């Protein structure tokens, strides 16, 4: 991947930093693995906004990604690496020996022509998927399952990874990039290596319109609203809001902890770094 800074030929180009993948496939995606991706505009079935700042954006199909990696013992060859508009990571189209094609997350250093495999007998190399009980302690992995057979849920975005720190019976302890240490079931699968396209974090959109292309609408400050719309709204002239920062629903923000999932607290060994 190459990081390209644009010449300031216009105000919108002045701050643009693009991440260009010279090895990405230039053609159309594999049609049998495409699905309709409807836009909601952030509205629910009653037509009410349930998620703010969503709407518009370019149309695109959803690429069906194999997060379960359950074709054990059947080798596959990487046919091409593709851009995916639905995620920060790139994806790889792989052809299995039985003729089936699937999309997977493209790990770092995976290239066209490489061979990958799933199952307990798979070698420890980037792109191979194994149960975590079969992965050596200290290994770097991504696409980690929280529940065996459910599919990968952790470490799926560009440049993400976990490190296996310890193995204790039915659980392994992994460290996330945030610094959080967490116990996950050792029967769950993970893929060797870290997710590719780590340069994604260097990207700068350069103008507001680039966010609109992605379906992201503007975020209006509460102090710019009326009292009916936000706790910070109203007042004569410009104000600071007159109270500690809160969300539109009155919950404290900017550092206030809102995590309520006590059910999974027992799996978190150490909270993330601040």
Swiss-Prot record:
SUPFAM superfamilies: Nucleic acid-binding proteins, Translation proteins SH3-like domain. InterPro entries: NA-bd_OB-fold, Rib_uL2_dom2, Ribosomal_uL2, Ribosomal_uL2_bac/org-type, Ribosomal_uL2_C, Ribosomal_uL2_CS, Ribosomal_uL2_dom3, Ribosomal_uL2_RNA-bd_dom. Residues 39-48 have a biased composition (Low complexity). The keyword Ribosomal protein applies. GO terms for biological process: cytoplasmic translation. SMART domains: Ribosomal_L2, Ribosomal_L2_C. Residues 31-53, 223-263 are annotated as: Disordered. One of its GO terms (molecular function) is structural constituent of ribosome. Keywords: Ribonucleoprotein, Ribosomal protein, RNA-binding, rRNA-binding. One of its GO terms (cellular component) is large ribosomal subunit. Part of the 50S ribosomal subunit. Forms a bridge to the 30S subunit in the 70S ribosome. HAMAP family: Ribosomal_uL2_B. NCBIfam families: rplB_bact (TIGR01171). One of the primary rRNA binding proteins. Required for association of the 30S and 50S subunits to form the 70S ribosome, for tRNA binding and peptide bond formation. It has been suggested to have peptidyltransferase activity; this is somewhat controversial. Makes several contacts with the 16S rRNA in the 70S ribosome. Belongs to the universal ribosomal protein uL2 family. This is Large ribosomal subunit protein uL2. The gene is rplB.
């Amino acid at each position: 991947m190459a990081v390209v800074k644009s010449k300031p030929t216009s105000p919108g180009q002045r701050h643009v930093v693009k991440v260009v993948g010279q090895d990405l496939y230039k053609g159309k995606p594999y049609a049998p693995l495409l699905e309709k991706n409807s836009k909601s505009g952030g509205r629910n079935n009653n037509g009410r906004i349930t998620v703010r700042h969503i709407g518009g954006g370019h149309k695109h199909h959803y690429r069906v990604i194999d997060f379960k990696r359950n074709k054990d013992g059947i080798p596959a060859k990487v046919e091409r690496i593709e851009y995916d508009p639905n995620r920060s990571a790139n994806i790889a189209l792989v052809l299995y020996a039985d003729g089936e094609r699937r999309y997977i997350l493209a790990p770092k250093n995976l290239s066209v022509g490489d061979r990958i495999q799933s199952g307990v007998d798979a070698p420890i190399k980037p792109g191979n998927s194994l149960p975590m009980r079969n992965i050596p302690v200290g290994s770097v992995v991504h696409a980690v399952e929280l529940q065996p057979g459910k599919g990968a849920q952790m470490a799926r975005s560009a440049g993400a990874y976990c490190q296996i720190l310890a193995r204790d019976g039915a659980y392994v302890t992994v460290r996330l990039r945030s610094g959080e240490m967490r116990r996950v079931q050792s029967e769950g699968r993970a893929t060797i290596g870290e997710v590719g396209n780590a340069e994604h974090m260097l990207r700068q959109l350069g103008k507001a319109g680039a966010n609109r292309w992605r379906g992201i609408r503007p975020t209006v400050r509460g102090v710019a609203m009326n009292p009916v719309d936000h706790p910070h709204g109203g007042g004569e002239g410009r104000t600071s809001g007159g109270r500690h920062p809160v969300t539109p629903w009155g919950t404290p923000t900017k550092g206030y902890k809102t995590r309520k999932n006590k059910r999974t607290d027992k799996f978190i060994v150490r909270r993330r770094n601040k």
